[in-house]
């Protein structure tokens, strides 16, 4: 052995050791999942009819998102936020009424369905989704797109007057296209389901 050590080979006989580092238990992780629902309402109505048009599938989509979180043993539902929007069609005052009350109708539906505490769900509303409207026009190939966008960006115009001028500028056919292809998508309810993922323990 001394002879080997003198030749620099003694290290071969040293026992190798592997150090095992114990991981720290992870802290709680905060997560969120988002979605959008496009509920249908009869004209000027604020009550949700679950069987009306596509409401069955849209409500199921919301429930599926919530259920995914609720049914996972590693997660805890901490809150739900709902943000409702109306389209610019009609007066701003009426659209404010619709956006506010339709948002509340969805809050009431979710609260009632799951028997949630009222404090679990928060909500807000936007009277008219002009941001979505502008994105639609900007991405379109409408003949008077630039003029319509200029009108949209004019902050000096009364909101109702602006909508009327856009309708006049677009013309009957183009405005009909906007009513059918754009406005329905601007009536939406965005929802965020917040939850925590518990940290693992060392046995896991």
Model-derived regions: residue spans:
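Periplasmic OmpA-like peptidoglycan-binding domain that tethers envelope proteins to the cell wall
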Residues: 87-191
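Amphipathic alpha-helical repeat scaffolds of TPR domains
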Residues: 203-204
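Extended amphipathic alpha-helical interaction segments
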Residues: 198-200
């Amino acid at each position: 052995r001394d002879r080997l050590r003198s030749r620099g080979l003694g290290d071969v006989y040293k026992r190798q050791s592997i150090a095992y580092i114990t991981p720290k238990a992870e802290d709680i992780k905060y997560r969120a999942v988002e979605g959008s629902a496009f509920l249908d309402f009869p004209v000027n109505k604020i009550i949700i009819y679950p069987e009306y048009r596509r409401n069955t599938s849209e409500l199921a989509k919301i429930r599926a998102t919530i259920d995914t979180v609720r049914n996972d043993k590693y997660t805890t539902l901490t809150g739900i936020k709902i943000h409702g929007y109306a389209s610019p069609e009609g007066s701003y005052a009426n659209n404010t009424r619709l956006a506010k009350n339709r948002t509340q109708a969805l809050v009431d539906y979710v609260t009632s369905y799951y028997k949630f505490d009222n404090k679990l769900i928060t909500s807000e509303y936007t009277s008219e989704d002009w941001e979505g409207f502008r994105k639609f026009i900007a991405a379109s190939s409408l003949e008077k797109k630039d003029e319509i966008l200029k009108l949209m960006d004019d902050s000096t115009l009364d909101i109702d007057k602006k909508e009327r001028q856009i309708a006049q500028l677009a013309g009957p056919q183009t405005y009909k296209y906007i009513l059918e292809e754009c406005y329905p998508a601007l009536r939406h309810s965005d929802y965020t389901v917040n939850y925590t993922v518990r940290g693992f323990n060392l046995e896991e």
